[in-house]
Amino acid sequence: MNAVLALNTATHPDFQGQGLFTKLASMAFAGAADAGYDYAYGVPNAQATPGLTGRQGFRLVCSLDADICLLPYRRPNPTADGEPVAAFQRIWSVDALQWRLSDPNARWRTKLRDPNTLQVWGPGPAPFVPTYEEIFLNADLRPLDGLFAPPGPMAFTPKLHLGKRPPGGVTPNVSIQIPDRLRPSPLNFVVKNLHGETPEIAAQEVIFTALDFDAY
């Protein structure tokens, strides 16, 4: 399944009230469908969510979690071959992951946690609080091993987990959940089928990470 990210957009004040946002969004989704994409997903805030779930036919799946964690993620079974497959999950290829981590405007730092797990740090809400994520290096990604710093001591430093993971799987470790009232803009995760009715996707069936969109 191929999916495309629906970027957050706005209409210039001089051109508001003419239906341009809805028209251009519909044209963009039609173009994505013609290009072979099956789904579109987005990460709107509370104000933008009704426009996507109403006029544009997106389904609201869940709110994204936001946690400040101090240690690498907790893994219930460290010897398992990666995470369980979810209903919605990004499957990285070598080229796609290299491209994502090489963004010149928001470059991610990387280090191997162990031979199977890549740690990544990216732009966050403050210079001393980076966004943090971990990627399981399956057989398809093993050619990238030599590009990353080797495993080292665990850093007891604050980092932001922003996304959604199934309960009982890989989860933030020694973490504090940020209440909605303290977030500048709480984010939701929405999905749209570009070729028909959007099926219901349960929040516990989603693996969605900060690498799947640009929060900062």
Predicted ranges, named:
Residues 4, 9, 119:
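Conserved GNAT-family N-acetyltransferase fold
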Residues 8-13, 44-46:
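Short, flexible loop/turn elements at secondary-structure junctions
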Residues 11, 16-34, 138-151:
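Conserved acetyl-CoA-binding loop-helix of GNAT-fold acetyltransferases
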Residues 33-39, 46-143:
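Amide-forming acyltransferase catalytic core, primarily the GNAT-like/NAT-type
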Residues 40-52, 158-171:
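Conserved beta-strand-loop-alpha-helix junction that forms the acyl-donor binding cleft
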Residues 113, 133-139, 156-165, 193:
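Structural motif
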Residues 168-216:
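C-terminal functional modules
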